[in-house]
Swiss-Prot record:
This is Pre-mRNA-splicing factor spf27. It holds the Pfam family BCAS2. PANTHER family: BCAS2 PROTEIN, PRE-MRNA-SPLICING FACTOR SPF27. It comes from the Eukaryota. Residues 58-222 form a coiled coil. The gene is spf27. It comes from Dictyostelium discoideum. Required for pre-mRNA splicing as component of the activated spliceosome. It is found in: Nucleus. Component of the pre-catalytic and catalytic spliceosome complexes. Component of the postcatalytic spliceosome P complex. Keywords: Coiled coil, mRNA processing, mRNA splicing, Nucleus, Spliceosome. Its main location: nucleus. One of its GO terms (biological process) is RNA splicing. The keyword Coiled coil applies.
């Protein structure tokens, strides 16, 4: 199961040729991002987890008792370690124990002896095989660490190659954009020149029309005088 953590993605695909934005542009960008994110449905990161199980705490009275104890700020009752103790014989004689108490004490002593024997066996096994077990465990960890490091290096190499390709692609595209921008400015300049020339021609035409009208009026006036 993959655990999805919000904001855990490491995105390093930054632009290589774009100019840095100013404060006003940054504010506008942040506002546009916030407006767009407000339309998104919040992701449910717990959808892949098992459904919630409602536990009936009435079946766990010991928890309720502990909660009450904690509310009262009472300390937990100490464990009874009496059965782990072996009373000295002199003390038992002074206490004038009956036969049952003597048998219980004897059984307890046997239990303690058996427990110590088991601990001794465990220590012997640990001394004999524990070192090799830890060596094997550490060897497995080293192999796992090397494998993960190799995978990490491969991923880093892939990311580096992709970023290099992106940089080259952006630089080539940027050159084309600059060429198109230059051509666009040249065309705009030419259009401006053409527009200016057209206006000059239109003005000249208007002047010629006006001159022609004046000449016609003058000719008509001369005819009327005759």
């Amino acid at each position: 199961m993959n655990i999805i953590i919000e904001g855990a993605e490491n995105i390093d695909s930054l632009p290589y040729v774009d100019d840095s934005v100013n404060e006003n542009e940054q504010e506008l960008i942040n506002k546009l991002i916030s407006d767009e994110m407000s339309t998104f449905t919040p992701p449910d990161y717990l959808a892949q987890l098992p459904s919630f199980i409602d536990i009936d705490y009435n079946n766990f009275q010991f928890l309720e008792n502990d909660f009450k104890r904690m509310e009262k700020e009472e300390k937990m009752k100490e464990f009874d370690i009496g059965r782990y103790k072996v009373e000295p014989t002199t003390t038992m004689i002074k206490q004038q124990l009956n036969e049952k108490q003597w048998n219980d004490s004897l059984n307890n002593a046997r239990s303690q002896l058996e427990h110590q024997d088991i601990r001794k066996i465990n220590l012997e096994l640990l001394q004999r095989y524990g070192g090799n077990s830890w060596k094997l465990y550490l060897s497995d960890l080293e192999i796992l660490q090397k494998t993960l490091k190799k995978q990490l290096d491969q991923k880093k190499q892939q990311i580096e190659e992709i970023n290099i390709q992106r940089k080259l692609s952006q630089e080539q595209t940027f050159e084309k954009i600059q060429q198109h921008d230059k051509k666009f400015l040249e065309l705009v300049y030419k259009n401006t020149e053409i527009e200016s020339a057209c206006k000059s021609i239109e003005l000249e035409i208007e002047q010629l029309k006006l001159k022609q009208q004046l000449q016609q009026q003058q000719e008509n006036g001369d005819l009327n005088n005759k």
